[in-house]
């Protein structure tokens, strides 16, 4: 292990922001970039009249709807650390892509709209984080508006999300009467002022909760604050770093992202407390981040990031060693060596050629159709990183096209979108129509829009009489062949070449499983493993 690699790994922080739609996640992403100096002016999210859109929302459909459909990656430096921020789709229909992004991070920042509390998507995403004991920092947003009682919010997080809360800051008032926050650990009060788009100035700080200046500044609120703090300190958990790193306790911050207030404290907590890159599981062994040899896995493929170029980028999380431009690395699934000369790093949709990268960094590899989600790369060692699943889709549509002459473009478009993970594509063993599977309706809208804009294909989706899909496998090849022959009408091949059973209803699936006890029906499948 070289000292250089060890030092670089210690400097890295890789995290994702998770939230329910409209909790303020994209705004917070912008402000984190603003505070770090990565951008000079924040784009206003959903600024339809101004024509200005958020740096991290770049696909046409996102611009129309003001939601983060694709996950962007942004790298910036802050306080002698390199931060990799992964923006996840906030819309509830995009849980599968979001899940895959969460396999590539070491910690997460959970944003909660303090007027609404814990919402459905937040619950789903936190459950995904819990599978890997990911440390979570919590930000209660929108205190410049009327919000719910802060103690109630903490109780709700603990009850519903089953994670203990340790408030680090505490709000003074809300809405028009929002005065600032008290930093419990530092015994300091940060005074609120509405912040604009430009780089924020320092907020005024008053030292000590018993400072006489507070009586002059806000005589009505100060006694209530002191009473609340006494109550919070008696009833809440103290911050404990080990419990945070184990994913058992979340530090909670309060503020207003749109006003740049509370952002600095979050950034500092991620630098000071969140873990550096951790070892990763592969099929053969655990891979340490400070090992000398380069390795990594693909967690996402994005088609056409630049509408001017019909390119696809495969997003790779570096797991160990040092990546250097021009180095030879092996694409292990197809056993092919590639020269990594045009690999890129990200600042949202701005791309720069990557000269070097270390564990925790995200790099983009141009993909001409050979790379799939879950693929592993190394300097030669046969590694297959695990923990990147596909989920059984819940909604299905069959696809037709208005212009039969464009069938090739349709097939190419769906193949690319299937590999990217935007939608799951199944080719039935009998019948000509392709079947699309998704976790939510919006995914079909995205596919319709992208087929039209990127491949020039007008597609029509019809409802398909399918209830669910299960990937099937069997060690006994003879039994599998019998199963295929008997159930040809319900079988399809997915974009990864795996056999799937498309069940018309729950009863049918149950009966089929009973009839064929030797066949294994899988609700998820690993990206890197062929069933």
Swiss-Prot record:
Cited InterPro entries: EF-G-like_DII (IPR053905), EFG_III/V (IPR035647), G_TR_CS (IPR031157), P-loop_NTPase (IPR027417), PrfC (IPR004548), RF3_C (IPR032090), RF3_dom_3_sf (IPR038467), RF3_GTP-bd (IPR041732)
Disulphide bonds in the chain: none
Localization: Cytoplasm
Binding-site list for GTP: 19-26, 87-91, 141-144
Gene Ontology BP annotations: regulation of translational termination
Keyword terms, alphabetized: Cytoplasm, GTP-binding, Nucleotide-binding, Protein biosynthesis
All residue ranges annotated as the tr-type G domain in the record: 10-278
Keyword check for Metal-binding: no
Pfam families on file: EF-G_D2 (PF22042), GTP_EFTU (PF00009), RF3_C (PF16658)
Keyword DNA-binding: no
Gene Ontology cellular-component terms listed: cytosol
An annotated Gene Ontology molecular function: GTP binding
NCBIfam families hit by this protein: prfC, PRK00741.1, small_GTP
Protein function: Increases the formation of ribosomal termination complexes and stimulates activities of RF-1 and RF-2. It binds guanine nucleotides and has strong preference for UGA stop codons. It may interact directly with the ribosome. The stimulation of RF-1 and RF-2 is significantly reduced by GTP and GDP, but not by GMP.
Family: Belongs to the TRAFAC class translation factor GTPase superfamily. Classic translation factor GTPase family. PrfC subfamily.
Protein name: Peptide chain release factor 3
């Amino acid at each position: 292990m070289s000292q250089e690699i060890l030092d670089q790994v210690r400097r890295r922080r890789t995290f994702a922001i998770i939230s329910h739609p409209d909790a303020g996640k994209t705004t917070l992403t912008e402000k984190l970039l603003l505070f770090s100096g990565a951008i000079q002016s924040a784009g206003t999210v959903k600024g339809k009249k101004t024509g200005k859109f958020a740096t991290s929302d770049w696909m046409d459909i996102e611009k129309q709807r003001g939601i983060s459909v694709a996950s962007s990656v942004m790298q910036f430096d802050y306080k002698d650390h390199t931060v990799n921020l992964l923006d996840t789709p906030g819309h509830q229909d995009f849980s599968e892509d979001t899940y895959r992004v969460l396999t590539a991070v070491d910690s997460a920042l959970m944003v909660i709209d303090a007027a609404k509390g814990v919402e459905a998507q937040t619950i789903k995403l936190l459950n995904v984080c819990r599978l890997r004991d990911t440390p979570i920092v919590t930000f209660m947003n929108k205190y410049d508006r009327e919000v719910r009682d802060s103690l109630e919010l903490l109780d709700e997080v603990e009850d519903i999300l089953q994670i203990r809360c340790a408030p680090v800051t505490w709000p003074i008032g809300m809405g028009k009467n929002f005065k600032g926050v008290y930093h419990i650990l530092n015994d300091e009060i940060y005074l609120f002022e509405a912040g604009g788009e430009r780089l924020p100035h320092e907020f005024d700080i008053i030292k000590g909760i018993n400072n006489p200046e507070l009586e002059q500044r806000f005589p009505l609120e100060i006694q209530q604050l002191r009473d609340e703090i006494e109550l919070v300190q008696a009833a809440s958990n103290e911050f404990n770093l080990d419990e945070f790193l184990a994913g058992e306790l979340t530090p909670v911050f309060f503020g207003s992202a749109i006003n740049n207030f509370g952002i600095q404290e979050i950034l500092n907590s991620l630098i000071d407390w969140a873990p550096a890159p951790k070892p990763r599981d592969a099929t053969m062994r655990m891979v340490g981040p400070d090992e000398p040899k380069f390795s990594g896995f693909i967690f996402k493929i994005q088609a056409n990031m630049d509408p001017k170029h019909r390119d696809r980028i495969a997003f790779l999380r570096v797991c160990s060693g040092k990546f250097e431009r021009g180095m030879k690395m092996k694409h292990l699934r197809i056993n092919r060596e590639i020269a990594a000369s045009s690999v890129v790093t990200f600042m949202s949709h701005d791309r720069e050629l990557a000269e070097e990268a270390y564990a925790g960094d995200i790099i983009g590899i141009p993909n001409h159709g050979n790379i799939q989600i879950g693929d592993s790369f190394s300097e030669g060692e046969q590694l297959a990183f695990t923990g990147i699943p596909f989920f059984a889709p819940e909604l299905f549509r069959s696809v037709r096209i208005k212009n039969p002459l464009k069938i090739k473009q349709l097939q190419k478009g769906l193949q690319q979108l299937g590999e990217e993970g935007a939608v799951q594509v199944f080719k039935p063993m009998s019948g000509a129509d392709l079947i699309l599977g998704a976790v939510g309706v919006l995914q079909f809208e995205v596919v319709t829009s992208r087929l039209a804009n990127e491949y020039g294909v007008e597609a029509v989706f019809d409802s398909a009489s399918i209830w669910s899909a299960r990937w099937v496998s069997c060690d006994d090849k003879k039994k599998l062949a019998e199963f295929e022959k008997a159930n040809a009408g319900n079988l399809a091949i997915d974009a990864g070449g795996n056999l799937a059973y498309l069940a018309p209803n729950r009863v049918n699936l149950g009966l089929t499983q009973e009839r064929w006890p030797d066949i294994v029906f899988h609700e998820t499948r690993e990206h890197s493993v062929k069933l």
